[in-house]
């Protein structure tokens, strides 16, 4: 009899736990994805803060030339970064217990791999948690689908690109200047500015910013007047009121006269779907571009594509970009190799014995 009571009590405890985890009445929804998201993101954030402040220099290139990235080793907020895991480790799984000591783990950049893997798992669970809450509230799944764009972008630069290049040392450093360094080296090695998927991403980000600003300014300008013309229209409203405060027909008419009739939306749902889809699709394409360039399917190469009647090269903008790429590449990892691959290849002219 005691066993039955204990089992019933434990089942009730587990049932209450399940109800609490999946309850939509909590101030912050947890969900089953949240059970994994919370510890992974807390771990990634904690290790990031500690490493950004106090991590010792990391031998990123695997040539016994450590690079300092933390605040206590001479960096500031702008120059500081979590240095990627050493090229000596490559793509190996490198938890703390695989190193001979904590000092060795830090020297080889173990914190970077720990942070990145926990972070990617955490943001993926955050996306799943968005879907889970939407499902329980009877909503459609578009919020999680939209969030998949930044998740795909982060996965591309922190995981897919290192896999394609063969080492976590090629991943994006976790810092401001480290991000810029990653962008410069990426351009030098893959000519990303000439990749059509990157161009679509630029159109998505800048276009999304433009459309967001246009929509916000139209909405805040198209107030339904609740006062006389001698009073401010703002007096007719309370901040946070439930009643609708703007007229989409008026906004549609204004914008249609500003450009042309069919340049504006007269349907609110179509408008907001467009505002969501434009940047999301653009960032999807950028993540796909990074993932293809990870395996060296690079941007277009139009170098020396224009010649005169005598075969002399007429430089175009593509040749200027190529020259800049070579300059950036020759300065990158200058002690790790004698020449970049592009500069080390040449044709041997035939000679008569």
UniProtKB/Swiss-Prot annotation:
Keyword Cell membrane: no
Subcellular location: Plastid membrane
Binding-site residues for pheophytin a, renumbered to this chain: 126
Positions that bind a quinone: 215, 264-265
Textual note on the cofactor: The D1/D2 heterodimer binds P680, chlorophylls that are the primary electron donor of PSII, and subsequent electron acceptors. It shares a non-heme iron and each subunit binds pheophytin, quinone, additional chlorophylls, carotenoids and lipids. D1 provides most of the ligands for the Mn4-Ca-O5 cluster of the oxygen-evolving complex (OEC). There is also a Cl(-1) ion associated with D1 and D2, which is required for oxygen evolution. The PSII complex binds additional chlorophylls, carotenoids and specific lipids.
Residues carrying the site annotation Stabilizes free radical intermediate: 190
CDD domains assigned to the protein according to its UniProt record, in alphabetical order: Photosystem-II_D1
Keywords: Acetylation, Calcium, Chlorophyll, Chromophore, Electron transport, Herbicide resistance, Iron, Magnesium, Manganese, Membrane, Metal-binding, Oxidoreductase, Phosphoprotein, Photosynthesis, Photosystem II, Plastid, Transmembrane, Transmembrane helix, Transport
Enzyme Commission code: 1.10.3.9
Residues binding chlorophyll a ChlzD1, per UniProt: 118
Binding residues annotated for [CaMn4O5] cluster, in chain numbering: 170, 189, 332-333, 342, 344
GO biological process: photosynthetic electron transport in photosystem II; response to herbicide
Entry-annotated residues carrying N-acetylthreonine: 2
Site residues, Cleavage: 344-345
Marked site: Tyrosine radical intermediate: 161
Any further remark recorded for this protein: 2 of the reaction center chlorophylls (ChlD1 and ChlD2) are entirely coordinated by water. Herbicides such as atrazine, BNT, diuron or ioxynil bind in the Q(B) binding site and block subsequent electron transfer.
Protein name, per record: Photosystem II protein D1
Originating species: Cuscuta gronovii (Common dodder)
